């Protein structure tokens, strides 16, 4: 039995990046031998085991043979006769097909180290085309390492284009596509993911709504990142956040990343109309917390951008967004809308403060005070709306 460190841990160590997790491949072993040494089997489709102490993953060396459509149609051979080189051959990119033994020696049969030095993402073999998810994985790796100058090899891009044109991308599950998308959106240069997919002709099946206005979507996504970076720079200089509008406050870190993800995804989709945003979010099965913000931004963007809103317009905005009961969501909507407003050259700080002041004024209206005047039945709602309109109008006086 021989054990090798493989994949991302080797790659990132060679790039002097922080290694987050370690995966190992085991050559010359059987499942029974692994279990007898205290490992716990967790893999359903192929033998993967958790180390009894570290809980790190150890997978038996395996080969894969295409047997059907999509990313699940494979026959796996994980017998003890499978060699390390055979296991590495099935991997997607050469930079992910480097192994390291327990003495620190590299086993690199497919030139991954040289490709790392040349900042090149290149497929290991023609078997790359058997798994359509790899189009999205390569786009994600290109996104992650773009700041280091990595590019995709021409022959790999050609293969990705042929895979997209074959229709195989449509066989993927929404969950897998969204997972790759979500992870890419939290990288330093998230726009690269969509640029690569466009180059690979891979937007049509999952992101068709973006195709007609991709340049604007990417520009707005870049704006979101620029606002975050400016906030971080201000934070680093001052050591604390100043009293600044929501859009310039430092975002959550990518470890939790929920707020950052919402802001960036909203920036990407803000150019769409409401129905287009709904279609895209439903197709990808985006979680409600995120899709609600995106759809509201697309539905009410004209109200949010209009600096001449009447009290009736603002009340319609608050009612439509249920800002009364969902105040935290509305606050997050304003934060997420900032990149699009900046893209449109709007003084968002001033506009946001105006909207927030109007909402605060309307929230001061107490329905019990209205009822106390003797108003009854349907007239209560009418009187409540009128009182809110009067309160909103008063902030400009």
Curated annotation (Swiss-Prot):
Domain HD: 213-324
Binding site for CTP: 8, 11, 91, 137, 140
Entry EC number(s): 2.7.7.72
GO molecular function, one term: magnesium ion binding
Protein's name according to its UniProt entry: CCA-adding enzyme
Family: Belongs to the tRNA nucleotidyltransferase/poly(A) polymerase family. Bacterial CCA-adding enzyme type 2 subfamily.
Pfam families assigned to the protein according to its UniProt record, in alphabetical order: PolyA_pol, PolyA_pol_RNAbd
Enzyme category, top tier: transferase
Organism: Alteromonas mediterranea (strain DSM 17117 / CIP 110805 / LMG 28347 / Deep ecotype)
